Amino acid sequence: MGINVGETLMGLVTTSGIYQYLTNPLALIMVAIACVLLYLAIVKQFEPLLLLPIAFGMLLTNLLGSDIFHEELFAGGHANWALFGGAVLIDGKDFVDSVGYMVNAAGQILTSNNVVLGHFVNAVTIDDPTSLVPFADILAQFAANGNAASVILEDAFLNNGAVYTATGAMLATAGKTISAGLLDYLYLGVKLGIYPCLIFMGVGAGTDFGPLISNPKTLLLGAAAQLGIFMTFIFAYAVFGFSDAEAGAIGIIGGADGPTAIWLTGKLAPHLLGPIAVAAYSYMALVPVIQPPIMRALTTEKERKIVMEQLKPATKTQKIIFPIVVTILVALLLPSAAPLVGCLMLGNLAKECGVTERLNKTMQNELMNIVTIFLGITVGATATASTFLTVRTLEIIAMGIVAFGMGTAGGVLLAKLMNKLSGGKINPLIGSAGVSAVPMAARVSQKEGQKANPANFLLMHAM
């Protein structure tokens, strides 16, 4: 049998990624956006440690034909485990898995029997995939197994994964077989909430809570800085028409905490993970640009010149007890936050106890770096044209900067009030550090304070 060169060449062309851009040209725009983000990460150094892997993940997922990431495996907001072994996509809507179950695009198991275009049929094994199995034979097998058929609209038969009527008209064709790619497996770390928790462990291992222990009332500044979260939630829900879950995920951008934003969005609105992650980390990188105008607008020259007294250092015992007590209180009062806060405090305890130096270094360096790579590249992979190039994305980006600005304003305004109540002993500039962008926000407070008064040293107070 000779080789048809024309058909072979045409097959090469039609299976190439370049050809697939003809049917999905918007993916080219996503490739361009990924390149812009790579430029910002490398040249402008905007949060490069995470923005670079996010951008590269976005690039990989939009190089069509690579099959490195499949949104279908995570449809409905959770991992569809039955599909990871390979599944057939029928009519773009329903999935038949390899063990005879049927789930819809939302990942719900509809029945323990196969469902084909509204027909409930029993799982059928075809020894010869080219043979035809009349629908009547399927019904006979149903009866033999003691099952009752339902919603039988017309006679049909199966042939090699395609569904035909009794007259031979095709009802639906079997689509691609879903075989999980590399990023599908790595994305499970996001889906299951593993990566954000491990990053918090690394953050805790490098954080000094001594200033907070020495001056507990500054905890209120962190609470006030969450104003942006709540106000953005209201705007997103009431004005822009997002669902309550989506609005909550968008509002968390105001906390200026990337891992928390990813963790919460993965729980509440996973379809918005790409836009929210990019917005959260972009605004974290822009802290030195966004915060100073707000800080100067809400404070007077006199307030910015206030020199705060140096804090009394926290004792070693206090630093060891602190993460243990916080973990217990948070787990009892707010159990849903226990995974994140528990990992944060575990890392901090490893730092402060003084007997696990090797673990502390691993958490801060090797573990943190590896997880950051996996987190970034998989979050970027969710940013496909269908989810990213929408009006909703522009609304998310706009509300994100509002959330960030309002969070900064909330912290500064409460710091002004605390300054009044303390008789002028608190510099309101430290209020902007109530957002979770550590240590960037604290550095901004330090810089603005020294601009007003070179003798000012606000860094530890802001931390």
Show where each model-derived region lies.
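Entry/N-cap segments of selected transmembrane alpha helices
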Residues: 211-233, 386-411, 462-463
